Amino acid sequence: MVLFGALMGLVTPFNQSLMIAFCCINASFFGWAQYESIAFTQLGVPQQDLGFSGGLAGMARYAGGSLAQAIYTTILTNTQTTRAAATVPAAAVRAGMSLENAQALLAALPLGAAAIAEVPGTTAEALGAASLAFQWSYAHALKVVALSSLSFGIVGLLCIFYCEDLTPKMTDKVEVFLENDVYADKNEFH
């Protein structure tokens, strides 16, 4: 998951198929990691602590997800805005627009075709150059987000070394039976 998350940093405006493949592979590993976390939650604690353990695991997952989303969104927004402010007007100026109109085009790009049409001096060449620079600014921001995910992944990989080995607990023994089961009397707690 760490590897394919970091490989998302290879994004360009022209390699959509490769990025879709990396997203699918990364999502597969993410799903596998969810099952692993459930196994550690359920098998790593005594029977009477299952509810508490599951609650803490769920809370940690939701809190971690919220924190990661806030961090990644902040990185994406700030990096893309900074990069677009530097590259979009420069690309439009190289394509023949004045600097003032290029700045107006930068402000109009996220607003759609109607806003772009109102910018004076906009030509097809300038619009094409500015649009490509805008796409590259997003690609750059996504690259920074993908590389920043490495820090979380490396910390997670280091935490794996401190996890309990669950192999001795992977047996045929059933810890808890349903109360209406014929083996309900084997339950330690009722």
What are these regions (language model features)?
Residues M1-V93, L142-C163:
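C-terminal module of multi-pass small-molecule transporters
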Residues M8, A86, A104, L132, ...:
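Charged/polar, solvent-exposed surface patches and flexible loops
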Residues E36, R83, S98-Q103, D172-F177, ...:
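Short, surface-exposed, polar/charged, turn-prone segments marking secondary-structure boundaries
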Residues I75-A130:
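Extracellular/lumenal N-termini and interhelical loops of multi-pass eukaryotic membrane proteins
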Residues L109-H190:
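Transmembrane-helix exit segments and adjacent C-terminal regions of multi-pass membrane proteins
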